Regions:
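Acidic, surface-exposed loops and disordered segments
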Residues: 1-188
Length: 188
C-alpha cells in the first residue's frame, strides 16, 4: 500500500490537543499541500487563513461556539487553525474548498499533527463580524467559509482505526470488464 493510501485509512479526527505550538515550517508544509488540491478549471480560488495568535484563535472559537449554541471550545484546544474560504462567485467553490480541507488533514497526519474539520465557517463569515475580520486582512472579494482545520499535537493516544461498516462495493459499472455485483447493475 502506498503511503498516501495508508494515511487516508489511518487519519482520524482529533478532539483533544496539547497546547504546544506547531513549528511554522510544519504549518507551511501543511498549507502547501492544501494548495495542491484539485480545483475547478484550475482556478485556485480558495484561500487559507492561518491563525496561531491565541487571542484571535479564542475570539474565533467564541464566535463559532455562539453559532453552535455552546459555551465550550469547538476547536478542542487546538493551538492552530487553518480557515478555508472559497470565492462565492465560482461555481465549484464549496467542492474546491472541501478538497483543500482534505489535503490539509492528510498532510497534517503525515507530519504527525492531529486535525479536525470544524464546521460553521460559512455562518461565521456571513456575519458582520466575519466580514470585518476578512476586511482587516485586506480580503475584499466575497468569500464563503468552507471549514476550519483545527491543528495540534495529539493529547493522549492516537485513536484506533474503526472498521468500516460496509465493505466497499460498486453499485453500477459500465464497461467490458463488467461483472454483476451484489445489488448492482451492469451494462456492457
Amino acid at each position: 500500500m502506498s503511503n498516501v493510501l495508508e494515511e487516508m485509512k489511518t487519519r482520524r479526527s482529533i478532539r483533544k490537543f496539547k497546547p504546544d505550538a506547531i513549528p511554522q515550517e510544519i504549518l507551511d508544509q501543511i498549507i502547501e499541500a492544501g494548495t495542491y488540491a484539485a480545483n475547478g478549471r484550475g482556478a485556485q480560488n480558495v484561500i487559507i487563513i492561518q491563525v496561531t495568535n491565541k487571542e484571535k484563535r479564542d475570539e474565533i472559537a467564541k464566535k463559532n461556539a455562539e453559532i453552535m449554541g455552546s459555551e465550550g471550545d469547538p476547536f478542542y484546544g487546538a493551538p492552530a487553525m487553518l480557515i478555508v474560504l472559497g470565492k462565492k462567485d465560482w461555481p465549484t467553490h464549496v467542492y474546491d474548498g472541501s478538497l483543500v480541507m482534505g489535503n490539509l488533514m492528510l498532510a497534517a497526519h503525515d507530519l504527525g499533527i492531529g486535525s479536525c474539520w470544524i464546521h460553521r465557517a460559512k455562518e461565521e463569515f456571513e456575519s458582520s463580524w466575519g466580514r470585518e475580520l476578512l476586511a482587516s486582512l485586506g480580503i475584499e472579494d466575497e468569500y464563503e467559509g468552507i471549514g476550519h482545520c483545527a491543528l495540534g499535537y495529539v493529547d493522549g493516544d492516537y485513536p484506533d482505526v474503526i472498521p468500516r461498516k460496509r465493505k466497499p462495493r460498486i453499485l453500477y459499472q459500465i464497461g467490458r470488464n463488467c461483472k454483476r455485483r451484489t445489488m448492482g447493475k451492469c451494462w456492457k
